[in-house]
Amino acid sequence: MVFERTLIDLIKGIRSHANDEEAFIATCLLECRKEATSQDADLKSEAILKLAYLEMLGVDISWASFQIVEVMSSSKILQKQKGYLAAVQSFKPDTDVLMLTTNLLKKDLMSSKVPEITLAIDGLSHFSTLGLARDLYRDVLILLNHSVPYVRKRTILLLYRLCLQYPEAISACIPKLRERLDDPDTSVVNAAVSVICELARRAPKNYLEFAPDLFHLLTTSSNNWMLIKLIKLFASLTPYEPRLVKKLIPSLTDIIENTHAMSLLYECINTIVSGNMLVGHSQCDKLASLCASKLRGFFEDTDQNLKYIALLCLRKLANTHPSLVSAQLDIILKCLVDTDTSIRLRALDLVNEIVNKENIRTIVKTLMLQLIVSSDESAVEDIRNSTATRIIEMTSKSTYMNIADFEWLLTVYVDLANIPGIDTGTLLNNQIIDLCVRVKALRPFSVDIFSQAILDPSYVSTTDCSVSEKRTDILPAIIWCLGEYAEFIEEYLDILDALTRPSFKKCSNLAHRLLLQAITKIFCQWCLEEEPTWGVEKFGLVKLWVEKIVSFIEQFLNFQDMEIQRRASEFYILFNQVSDIVNTSDTMEVLELQKKPPYIVQNTMYKLFFGEPLNPVAVKAQRKVMPDENLDLNCPINGVIEVPKELLENIIQSDDSLINFDTEVPSSGIDTFSKKQFNSLESVPVQRDLSSPFYLSSNQHTTTTNSEPENLNVETSMSDEAFNADKVTKVTKNKRRRKIFTSPSLQAMVVAQDEVPEGISLADIENKENPSNSNVYSLISLDPPLSTNQGSMGDIVLETKSPIRVEKKKSKKKKKKKEKTSGKE
C-alpha cells in the first residue's frame, strides 16, 4: 500500500467491502502486523488502535500483546491512551505480558499528571490479576489521599476490584475506607459507601464497626441514592447486632413518612419487613400498619413494577402481621385477575399465606372465575395449572383448618375438574379421596354427587376432546369413592349399569384398576342390602347381574396393563365362584335352605372388602417403626445359591429321563386315573384352607343349612356411633327399601388425623427435628367429640384435644325418614 490507513479509513473500507468483508479485514490485518513492528511510535500507536477496533469484530490480536505494552509505556498521553484501550479489550488473566506491566502501572499511578493516573486506574480495574493486586494495592492506597476528588473516587472503586482479587488486602483497606466516609466531597463518600456495601454482602459481621459513621450519614444525608445504599447495608448488619433495630426505627419511620421517592420508600419498607424489625418492641404494630398503608399506594400507581415489588413486600409482611395484609384483600384480588402474568403469580403466592376461614370463599371464587374466563382466551397452560394447584393447596392447608363447609369444598373440587384446559388430575384425585377418607360425615353427600356424575353418559366421553377442551380426569377418585362407600348408594343397579357401560373402555389405566374393584364392592353391598326382601325375584336379578359382570370383566383378561390383567383375573374367578353357586337347577330348594344371599357374598366377599375401616396414615409413620436389631436390610435374602456339582448332574439326568418317559409311556396310561377320581382329589381342601376367610368353598351354601346364621355385625369405633342405628326397615314391594341412619347432618363433621404405629407419637420426632415447637399441640385430634364443645351452626371448634367439627344443616329427607322410623318403632 502506498499510504497507511487511519482508523477512519479502516471503518470506511469495511463498510464499502460488504460483499468480501473477510478478505478486506485479512488484508488490513497484514498491514497492521507490519505497522505494529515499525519504529515510528505514531504509526505503531495507530496500528494498535486499528487492532483494538478489529478485536471488537472478533479478530484475535493476542499476538500483539507485547506491542500493546510498548505503546502503553509511551510518554505521550495520546499514544498511552491508545495502548491502555487495546490492553483493556485484549488482555486476559492468562496473558503472558501482564507481568511486564507491574512497574509500568506503578510509574503511572505515582505520576504527577492526573490523566496518566486515571488511565492506570482504569486499566488495572479491567485486567488486574492476583499478582497485580498483591503487588500494587499499597500504591493504590496512597492515592486515597490525593488532592483531586476525582482520583480519590476512582481509587476507592479500584480497591473493590483489588480486594476481590486479593482478599488479604481487605484488612489494610478498611481503615482507609472508613476515613473516606468523612471526605468533604460527596462523590467520594458515595463511592466509599458503595464499596463498603458491596464488601459487607460477603461478610457483614466484619463491618459492624462502620455502624456509627454510617448511621450519621443516614440521618444527615439528603442524597436518595446514598440513603438506599445505607439502608441496604443496615439490613445486612441488623441480624448480627439486634440493638441496631431500636436505633434505626425512628430514622426509617421518618423517611417513610416524608419521602416521595418510591425507590427509597420501597427500600425502607423492605428493610423493615426483611430485617426482623416488626417484632420485639412496642412500636412494631404501628410501624407494620404504616408499611401496609404505604404499600397500598404502590398499587394505585400505573407502574406495574411497583405492584410487583409491593406484592413481594406484602408477602414478607404476612409472616408477622397477616391480619394487616388480609385487610388489603381487595387490591390483592384485583392483582389475581391482572393481565400481567408475573403479578398474578405473585398474588397467588400471597393469598396462599393470608387465607383464613373468613376470606377463603372470596379468594376461591375469584380464582375460579379467573380460570373460567381465561379458558376462552389463549392463556398460558402453566399459569392455569398453577392457579388450580394453589386452590387445592390453600383449601387443604393444615388438614383443612380453614374449611367450615366440607360440602362446599367438595363441590369446588368437582367444579375445578370441569373447567377445561387444566391438568391437575393426580393432585385433584388424591385430594378428593383424602377429603372423603378424613371427613366421615361427608361421605353420603360425596356419593350422592358422584352418583349423579357417573350416571351422566357424557361424563366419561371426554377423552377424545382437544387439549384446550379436555377436562381434568377425576374418574379414579369418583369410582374409588363409590366402591369404598357403597353403603350410601341409593340406586345400586343404576350405578352398576353405568359402571359397566362400553364407554368406560376409553378410561385411563388407573380408572380401569379401580373400576373392577368398585363393581365388586357395589355388587356385594347391594346383595347385603337386599337380604330382608330376598326372594325369587331378587335371586333372579343376582343371577343376571353376575352374568353381566362376568362378561364385563372378561374383556380385561387380556389387557396390556399387567395390574389390570391381574385384578381382572382375580375378580373373574371370584364371580365365577358366585355364578356356580347361584346357577343351580333347583332354585326354590336353594331359597328354602338359605333365605338370604349366597354365603360367599354375605361372608367371604364382605370380609374381603369391608372388614376393616380405611383410615389416613401419616406420611412419616413408616420411618418411625424401628427395624429389628437382627435384621440386616443390606444383606440379600437368599444370597448366592451354589448348586453342588453332584446335585446338578442328578437334575440333568432326571430331565433326560422325563424326556424319555414322555416318548415311551403309551397314551392308554393316561386313562388309568379317571377324571372323576381326579376331581374328587382336587376338591379335598387342606385343613388350613377351611379356617381361612378367603377360602371359597363350592358347597358353602349346603354346609350352612343346619347352622345358625352368622353374625355379620362389625364392631364400630366411637367415631362411627352416628351410623349405628337400625339400618333396615320393612318395606312393601312397591316401595323401594332405603337404609335409615341416624342423620349425620345432626353430628359434627370430624376431620380424621393421620394414623401412626402403636406406641409411637408424631410429636416425638417433631420435637427432635424442631425443638422450638416442642410445646405446640396439634389443633386436630382423633379423640371423640365432646358434647360440651358443640358449637353453633358453621362454627369450627378449635381445642387442643378436640377434633375440628362443623355443624351441618338438617336434611329434610333424612328428617322425614327418621320420623317414619320412630313411628314404626
From Swiss-Prot:
It is a peripheral membrane protein. It comes from the Eukaryota. Its main location: Golgi. It holds the Pfam family Adaptin_N. It is found in: Golgi apparatus; Cytoplasmic vesicle, Clathrin-coated vesicle membrane. InterPro entries: AP3_complex_dsu, ARM-like, ARM-type_fold, Clathrin/coatomer_adapt-like_N. The keyword Transport applies. The keyword Ribosomal protein does not apply. Keywords: Cytoplasmic vesicle, Golgi apparatus, Membrane, Protein transport, Repeat, Transport. HEAT repeats lie at residues 131-168, 169-205, 207-243, 244-281, 285-323, 324-360, 363-400, 469-513, 515-547, 548-584. Residues 787-825 are annotated as: Disordered. GO terms for biological process: Golgi to vacuole transport; protein targeting to vacuole. Residues 807-819 have a biased composition (Basic residues). GO terms for cellular component: AP-3 adaptor complex; clathrin-coated vesicle membrane; endosome membrane; Golgi apparatus; nucleus. PANTHER family: AP-3 COMPLEX SUBUNIT DELTA-1, DELTA ADAPTIN-RELATED. Part of the AP-3 complex, an adaptor-related complex which is not clathrin-associated. The complex is associated with the Golgi region as well as more peripheral structures. It facilitates the budding of vesicles from the Golgi membrane and may be directly involved in trafficking to the vacuole. Belongs to the adaptor complexes large subunit family. Adaptor protein complex 3 (AP-3) is a heterotetramer composed of 2 large adaptins (apl5 and apl6), a medium adaptin (apm3) and a small adaptin (aps3). This is AP-3 complex subunit delta.
